[in-house]
A protein has these predicted regions:
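Internal, conserved structured core segments that host functional sites
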Residues: 93-146
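Short, Lys/Arg-enriched N-terminal segments with co-localized hydrophobic residues
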Residues: 1-5
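Extreme N-terminal starter segment of soluble prokaryotic enzymes
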Residues: 7-11
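Short N-terminal binding/cap micro-motifs at the start of the first secondary-structure element
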Residues: 18-26
Length: 146
């Protein structure tokens, strides 16, 4: 409360959860509860790693592969490694978010960039295991530990 006015807490959020058409296929993953109900009480700071990193819409879908400690972000059809552009952008973005006074972040589950836990990580035989963390989410959580 500041001057008798209740200030809303600020939360980062994956942009697609607010209904914005930023997913690889031009779609969204609107969560009406987050937008319409919780949104009355919080101020969201939307972040879409793929579009903000310059990957465009539409774009090829991506997945994680390799080592759980240093996963690679790879396009699913052509196998293009997008890790370095994502890591570079994410490092800059988390530093920008320092001034946003965030109280938390709502990540898009299962996303190879924004998934907080149990994201599919493909091994060298292309067998998936739900043990990964999205590239941006991992960098964000290291930068802003609990």
């Amino acid at each position: 409360v500041r001057g008798g006015i209740v200030e809303k807490i600020r939360l980062g959020i994956s942009t697609c959860l607010l209904g914005e058409p930023v997913r690889y296929d031009g779609g969204h993953k609107l969560d009406r509860y987050l937008r319409d109900t919780l949104g009355q009480y919080v101020e969201y700071v939307p972040v879409c790693p793929e579009t903000e990193a310059g990957f465009g819409i539409p774009r090829e879908s991506m997945h994680l592969e390799g080592d759980v400690e240093a996963p690679r972000l790879v396009t699913s059809r052509t196998g293009r490694d997008m890790t370095e552009p994502m890591v570079g952008w994410a490092g800059d973005r988390v530093r920008q978010l320092e001034v946003e006074n965030l109280c938390g972040f709502v990540f898009k589950a299962n996303s190879p960039s924004s998934g907080m836990e149990r994201v599919k990580l493909f091994d060298r035989n292309h067998v998936p295991r739900k043990i990964g963390v999205g590239v941006f989410a991992g960098i964000f959580m290291k930068h802003f530990p609990l």
